[in-house]
Amino acid sequence: MGTFTLHQGQSNLIKSFFRNYYLNAELGLPNDMELREFALQPFGSDTYIRHLSFSSSEELRDYLVNRNLPLHLFYSSARYQLPAARDMEEKAWMGSDLLFDIDADHICKLRSIRFCPVCGNAITSEKCERDNVETLEYVEMTSECIKRGLEEARNLVEILEDDFGLKPKVYFSGNRGFHVQVDCYGDCALLDSDERKEIAEYVMGVGVPSYPGGGENAPGWVGRKNRGINGVTIDGQVTIDVKRLIRIPNSLHGKSGLIVKEVTNLDDFEFNEALSPFTGYTIFLPYISIETEVLSRNIKLNRGVPIKIESSIGIYLHLKNLGEVKAYVR
């Protein structure tokens, strides 16, 4: 048997689900989209298509549906005079929004399994020598871990609002965490990497002393420290980078099939099937036997035994490497 490589979302059926979604999706595009660089990872490719520029949502939709269907879709946090220029200097940077990234898997220890998609055996290496195929990895994302990520987002919002006077927006990343974004103009947009690093370190609590004896309701870090909040777990590199790509709100995450969605009320957020746009049922063929939590549900799969399951779950399982969606059932 020759070497077998499985690209996430390789299936034509999964592509049709994504294409149908983008035909009518109302993407959350910035008002100044003509100043933003757009980028995407198409189906069946490990590389990104970058340096794209669009002047309207209709032009973008036509490109996505008819030319390059995205597995992952982004625009730049930066504004540029020439966003389609291939040389970063030629783009002429005009400022950037302020970004924070919270990955729940950096907060929790998650169960992960590496296995061969042909024989179904658990394998620690990146290749199954018996079947001469690359192994796949599945990482179980639990609702409890997402809740912990949401709590980090809540603490971050408090710091940005109370200590900086900013108005952040929180987005579910579509997979395993949250993005917090501040739309920046004027001086905020022109913050350089060193200044953004200072903000990142501040929200992470770097160098913030303890305040024993202070009340839990005291303002700022005094109250936070006495409530047991020592800092927010963020990926500091995301905040520092003034030319970072952002997942487009209401786009689909190619590793889950879930929507990148603004969370307007943190108390109401739930990690469940409502985050998927897909309806109906699919026939799903598992690669391995496993019991696992999927979008706050416990799912039992038996290797090689097809099951009829909600499309939201089936597509999620497919993109998480646990098997293949074989058919769509209304």
UniProtKB/Swiss-Prot annotation:
Pfam families: DNA_primase_S (PF01896), PriS_C (PF20873)
Domain of life: Archaea
GO cellular component: DNA-directed RNA polymerase complex; primosome complex
BP GO annotations: DNA replication, synthesis of primer
InterPro entries reported in the protein's UniProt record: DNA_primase_S, DNA_primase_ssu_euk/arc, DNA_primase_ssu_PriS
CDD domains linked: AE_Prim_S
Required cofactor(s): Mg(2+); Mn(2+)
EC number: 2.7.7.-
Residues reported to bind Zn(2+): C116, C119, C128, D131
GO molecular function: DNA-directed RNA polymerase activity; metal ion binding
Active site: D101, D103, D235
Record keywords: DNA replication, DNA-directed RNA polymerase, Magnesium, Manganese, Metal-binding, Nucleotidyltransferase, Primosome, Transcription, Transferase, Zinc
Assembly behavior: Heterodimer of a small subunit (PriS) and a large subunit (PriL).
Function: Catalytic subunit of DNA primase, an RNA polymerase that catalyzes the synthesis of short RNA molecules used as primers for DNA polymerase during DNA replication. The small subunit contains the primase catalytic core and has DNA synthesis activity on its own. Binding to the large subunit stabilizes and modulates the activity, increasing the rate of DNA synthesis while decreasing the length of the DNA fragments, and conferring RNA synthesis capability. The DNA polymerase activity may enable DNA primase to also catalyze primer extension after primer synthesis. May also play a role in DNA repair.
Family (UniProt): Belongs to the eukaryotic-type primase small subunit family.
Protein name: DNA primase small subunit PriS
Organism the protein comes from: Saccharolobus islandicus (strain M.14.25 / Kamchatka #1) (Sulfolobus islandicus)
